[in-house]
């Protein structure tokens, strides 16, 4: 299983909604190409509110537990958020291989948003 690490919150380039759409596109691309991938920020935001700090922390902690079960971490985008950095550092500590894909649109084969 591959852990998808990409931004959730709005940044200099994308809104939160756009970041979620990009994560969905990444996961869809993985699925149709035979890669079992999980993007915890897509899953946990279905029932936890990322704007409530307590719920955000809960989601991040559960996400770290899932990350520890993965064989690889794939990092998408050229903007690394603080949450992404924490995931990268955890993967490094656990010895989980990390792959970087700074150009999401190129990786997907075309612009998605």
Model regions and ranges:
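Catalytic phosphate/metal-binding cores of nucleic-acid and nucleotide-processing enzymes, i.e., regions
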Residues: 1-113
